[in-house]
Each structure stands twice: as structure tokens, then as C-alpha cells.
Amino acid sequence: MLTVNKLLPQGQGLAPVLLKRAAAVQLDWDVRQKSRFDAVDSQGRTLGVFLPRGTVVRGGDVLVAEDGSMVRVEAAPQNVLVITPCSEHGSPFDLTRAAYHLGNRHVQIELQADHLKIEPDHVLADMLRAMHLTVRETQAAFEPEGGAYAAGGH
């Protein structure tokens, strides 16, 4: 088992050729928000990941093992609800209103210019449909917002 205890956000400082050569690991959001987990990379190696508590792993980040090997993180497709304005009489403002209501419920949400994504929840799906939004379930990568107090800079 390879022990991983370092993370390079978005592969910062690494040459593109190194990123291209690195093994990859696909992780869903449930795993990526944990600081300790096991996974298997694209080369079949078992990874024991031990990051500082509170660390969130994002697609595009690079995990660095104790032996110096690198593993590129990919956000694995998972079940998500994709929310879009009604094609007949909706507007982009409808997404703003939906994001407001979802935020009031502390729902993790991925914001895009033309859609929102959340993890499946039939109660929320019904609420959004009642707001005249289109809600469909699909398989896609999920990268929710970090929130107002998430680490990171401009």
C-alpha cells in the first residue's frame, strides 16, 4: 500500500508532462470530502490517503505518496440532479432563486452558468419542480462550492 500524505491543489507547480504521466484515481464526492480513505489508482496500486483533517480533495488535485509518486485525482461520475430553468417560460434568475433556497437548507451545490447540480434528494427535487425548474437525474462529476469559509485565495 502506498501511503499518501500530501496534496498539491490542481497540481500547482507541476509541468504538464508530469501530470500526463501520473497515475489517476477516480473518486466520488463522498470520498473526496474525507481526509482519510483507501483507493486504487489506474496502475492498480492501493493508496492509503492520510491528509490533514478538514482537507477536501478536488478533481485536478494531485496526491503525492511518501515514495514521491504522484496520482492525479479525477472527480468520478456519480448520481446527481441537474437543475435548469424551464425551457418554455424560465429564466436564469430562476437558478439564482433555486440556489438561494438550496443554500438556506445547507445543501452542497455545484454552480454553473446554465445549471445547478446537487446530490439526489426527492424532497428537494419536488421543491425545485414546484418552482417551475427542470430537474433530471444523471451521472456526472460533482464539484460543489467550497462555501464562504473554505480555504483558498483569489
Predicted regions and their residues:
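Helix-rich terminal scaffold detector
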Residues: M1-R21, V31-K34, Q43, K117-H154
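Compact, glycine-rich, soluble single-domain proteins
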Residues: A23-Q26, R32-K34, D38-H101, E110
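Aromatic-residue detector
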Residues: R53-V56, Q112, D121, G153
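Conserved, well-structured core segments that form or line functional sites
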Residues: S87-E137, A141
